[in-house]
């Protein structure tokens, strides 16, 4: 059994350090070390050895993925549903025209914080919190936003600062 994560604690830390994080990531964008991708991947792996997502699942409880057509097709097929039926049951279109869940938390999140469609989950879920992508400095605003929701994203930025500054 994994140790429960104090989501509010990490949220408060992220709020307190938001300006510092923004400045650090902004500087990183201006002058990134040549081996940044390697450093970032190592830190990503280190963070996810410490953080068990199933002890948190805050992303699944509070952030909804933006569904792409490939996601909808894959998940509807998994449930043996026609696309319109899947969309009618689970999705709505937001003010930006994106397809998102009708309700949160995620309807596929179990009481044990496990995803019931893990193998076919949306791309946005698969890639969250995006800390293992190359050229991390290209998504600074998203990274800052993710630190407010995801303890692993917060730790990633903190460890990256320690390593680079």
Where are these regions (language model features)?
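Short loop/turn segments that flank or connect secondary-structure elements
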Residues: 1-165
């Amino acid at each position: 059994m994994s140790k429960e994560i104090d989501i509010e604690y990490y949220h408060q830390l992220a709020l307190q350090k938001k300006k510092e994080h923004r400045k650090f990531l902004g500087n990183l964008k201006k002058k990134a070390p040549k081996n940044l991708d390697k450093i970032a991947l190592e830190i990503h792996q280190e963070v996810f050895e410490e953080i068990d997502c199933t002890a948190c699942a805050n992303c699944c409880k509070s952030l909804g993925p933006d569904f792409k057509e490939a996601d909808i097709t894959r998940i509807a097929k998994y449930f043996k549903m026609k696309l319109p039926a899947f969309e009618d049951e689970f999705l709505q279109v937001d003010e930006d025209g994106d397809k998102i869940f009708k309700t949160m938390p995620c309807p596929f999140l179990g009481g044990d914080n496990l995803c019931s469609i893990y193998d076919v989950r949306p791309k946005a879920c698969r890639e969250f919190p995006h800390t293992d992508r190359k050229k991390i400095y290209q998504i600074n605003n998203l990274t800052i936003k993710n630190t407010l929701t995801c303890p692993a994203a917060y730790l990633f930025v903190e460890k990256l600062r320690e390593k680079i500054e």
